[in-house]
Amino acid sequence: MAENDKKSLLSITSTAESPLTAVRIVAEETISQLFRFNIDVVAAGKINTTNMLNKPACVAVNHGGKSTRYFHGIVSEFGLLEQSGTIDKAYRMVLVPQLAQAAIRSDCRMFFNKTAQDILKIIFDDAGVTKTAFRLYSQPAQRKATAQFNETSLHFATRLMEEEGWYYFFEHTSDSHTLVVTNDNNGFYTIPGATLRLGVGTTADMITEYRKPELLAAGKVTVKDYDFDAPDKNLKMEQNTILKHGGTSNRPVFHWPALTRDTDMAKNRARWRMEAAEAAVSLIAGGGDNGGLVAGGKFKLRTDAGEQVHIVQSITHSAEDVSERAGVVDGTNYSNRFMAFPNTTPWRQPMATARPRMEGLHTAKVLAPSGEEIHTDDQGRIKIRFFWDWREDATADNSEWVRVVQPWAGNQWGGQFIPRVDTEVAVAFMDADPDRPVVIGGLYNGNDKPIFPVAEKTKLGFRTRSVTKGGTDAFNEFTFDDKKGNELLFLHAQKDMRTEVENDQTLTVENDRTVTINKGDESVTLKQGDQSTELKLGNISVKCDLGSITMEAMQSITLKVGLNTIKIDQTGITVTGLMIKIDGQVLTEVKGLMTQVQGTAMLQLGGGIISIG
């Protein structure tokens, strides 16, 4: 990069093909915000403005040889302001951090089983951030599932850091700037030799403006959440303020949800929210001409009450160097206005970056490991991939379990339907939270057609599919047909069917009843009680085409028609009737150790030949 040789208040280094002279800079820096440096420059030659974009540049503010403050960034804007005379041209250049490109990028994607630091590294790398530093004073927890949905990568990264209690700032050198992420005041930068005093004067260590307003803050922060793995867990956490303001009980703040199912994290979220409220009312406003101040930088402030370390929360630098153009000896000036807070006050960003609200329904595809058609856990959850998640490598192994709504749910009772692999499901989000999806049902599509075609639109019901690799002819089914005059309830078991009744069963048939057993046996076992079959009108027919009929009783069997009976019991067989006729077409044989034939009124024997004895 070319650097002008001018030893003055402002100097600039850039990739411009013609030397640039910086004449004015207004630089804005704030913790957890992108810096923006507006720089007016003059070029002696022609500048290709398009070639300047996304190129590095640095402005140095030289404070009388005592210190130099660098403002490094990439060019996000470069345009002509005015033409001076016939040669020099004035341009406006804007420098921003490399992270600013994340404000342009937007995405819809899921991150599984990663810490916030892991996710941020991906975001920073995607945005072309070359230098980062994480100064974290606690180990980040692994996040099971984190969604970025229709939001810029900067928006996503900012809200992620706010949820973790983190914040960021930038450190500048002559040839680079570093994005620093931290979660503790110890992570801020100590400005070398920066000790400022309140008072009136022209030296760089004087603060010429100072204001410390007293403001009311929340008296208590309460957060609450719910853990479906442990429904009785107490996730209501409270944090009282340490500020000695009156009426704190009148200013409670409640937040739902806490965005965590972890007790320790819920405590942290309550504390971080309280610290953010306290930090916001601890700010002082100041101004002066110490050019070494930087957002996220520590300096000592000396007052009548003593010396205390403060940290710059935001600052606006204004510098102008027009001595050469104005033709005067000293046409330079520098000043700043800043906000700062005591180092004894933990800094915390408010959770102000809105989470995307997942309104309406979303659709997803059910995932399962290779060879599995039903993939679930002990809570009936499934793995899914949203259609807006463009990852081609999404599998059941790198996805998170998602709960499934059932028509009824209790402790081992209710309904249970587990969506199967490759089917499409509708997904809603608890509290519209992108990290809390829940499957609410299945959807037919161009590949997965409804059970019944349009011609059978009067039918409704359930049809399953046999697992594994069951075809269209392998299913269980329970359906209804509501076509007028042809109403039907249909039950199909692909293999076996078992019915259990703990007490009574009543079956009423108003017309015909047909039972067909194509092959196999039929068995009815009555362990205790009576069996009765009553036909009030009609006939009973029992037919065995190729076999035999056996009836067995421990006590007796009785056949009865009117007054005529045939009784078989343990003593023998008794035939009683108004008339008993035995007709043997070929032979009739009566045989026993004792045979008695008796006619009370008359005994008649007849035959072509009668042989006795």
Please provide the spans of the model-predicted regions:
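Polar/acidic, low-complexity leader/linker segments enriched in S/T/G and N/D
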Residues: M1-L20, D205-I207, E359-K365
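Short alpha-helix capping/helix-loop boundary micro-motifs
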Residues: N38-I47, E278-D289, W408-G414
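Surface-exposed cap/loop segments at beta↔alpha junctions
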Residues: T49-A133, Y137, Q142-T146, E171, ...
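Short, well-ordered loop/turn sites that connect or cap secondary structure elements
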Residues: N51-M52, G292-L293, P419
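Short, Lys/Arg- and Gly-enriched loop/turn segments at beta-strand edges
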Residues: G65-G73, G306-S314, V322, A432-G442
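Short, solvent-exposed secondary-structure boundary/capping segments
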Residues: L80-L95, L179, A319-F338, I374-Q379, ...
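Extended, domain-scale alpha-helical bundle/helix-rich regions
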Residues: K114-T132, S138, T146-T344
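Structural signature for extended repeat/solenoid scaffolds and their inter-repeat hinge/linker regions
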Residues: F170, V181-T182, M358-D583, T588-K591, ...
